Amino acid sequence: MRTRILTLLLLLFAFIANAQSTYVRLVTNRGNITLLLYDETPKHRHMFVQTIKKGLYNNAQFNRVIKSFVSQGGELDETILDREKQHPEIPIQRLAAEIKPNLFHKKGALGAGRNDNPEKSSYLTQMYLVVGKPQTDEQLDALEKKKGIKFSSSQRNTYKTTGGTPHLDNDYTVFGEVVEGMEVADAINSVKTDKNDLPLEPVTFKPVILSKKQAAKFKAIKH
């Protein structure tokens, strides 16, 4: 009887955890990318959902694309900082970092952009998708020594095979990942850019929050 009750409770907890998962589709002019927003970073998840609902990402562009590194979208640093400079009466808005050791910059990771600040707090309207490249043990060893961090064996394997940008770990908040459409993210990361990393042809995107029915196909995916 106890075993049966325990099994039912575990199933209930699993159902609740899945029900809380949030998925967002980036509808781009190069194809669609589906993202899972992590439950472990609730403030960033909520922030991204709210900015989408407010339309702050409507007509957004990937405006900083660096091949084999990241594709950054939303507002540029210069736009945000200039607005803050021109309107000192408006309090500067940042989101406290939610940096977790198990949420790392593997290929497909969704991160929050930021300026150089000691709190590592995030912008509200800037995100990036990691493409990166495979790393060697020597490179990872050097990063561990330089940054005072430790990569798990699983993280090492991911960085050595799939790739990513491990030098960003422990400095920027990772709050989601690509679960569908990585080939689109790769294509965007390969577009031609000018000297400022701006795509020569605009790459636009609009985030759309998926309904429970639309998200159901992704429920079995674990990061």
Protein language model annotation of sequence segments:
Residues 18-223:
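Cyclophilin-like peptidyl-prolyl cis-trans isomerases
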Residues 1-5:
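Positively charged n-region of N-terminal signal peptides that target proteins for export
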Residues 6-11, 168:
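Residues at the start of alpha-helices and the adjacent loop-to-helix junctions
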